[in-house]
Amino acid sequence: MSIYKNHIAIIGAGISGLMLGIILKKHNIPCVIFEKYNTVSEYGAGISISPNGLKILEELNLLNKLKMVSANPYKTNFYSNSSMITSIPVDVVTTSRQSLYKVLLDEYLSLQGDILFDHELIDINLSKKTLSFLNNIN
């Protein structure tokens, strides 16, 4: 795997791994994602992304793509005994994990990002600067 000798290794192709990969690729920093499973996960629950997360998505030009496949509530209502007692504005995007994952995966792949599947990490050798995987590919 000497073609990745000078790349930053990202362990895991989840939301965080893809986000890091996108940031690195957009800054022209070579990276590769190693994923222990043989495919991406399609499972997950609904999530709400708060302003700090939205800011990062905006900086990466991904917020509008995510909003197109998400709910964008503008307020939250509070009720007591079936009567609304107050309403406050909210700045969140509510989406499914799958929708967020697809936006991130599509972006990472469009940046020519590599994901190596079936690569379960079993060891990091800091002195040799090598990774070892369960599939014996180093």
Residue spans for each PLM region:
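Glycine-rich NAD(P) Rossmann-fold beta1-alpha1 loop
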Residues: 14
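Conserved N-terminal helical subregion
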Residues: 2-8, 50-138
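N-terminal Rossmann-fold NAD(P) dinucleotide-binding loop
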Residues: 17-18
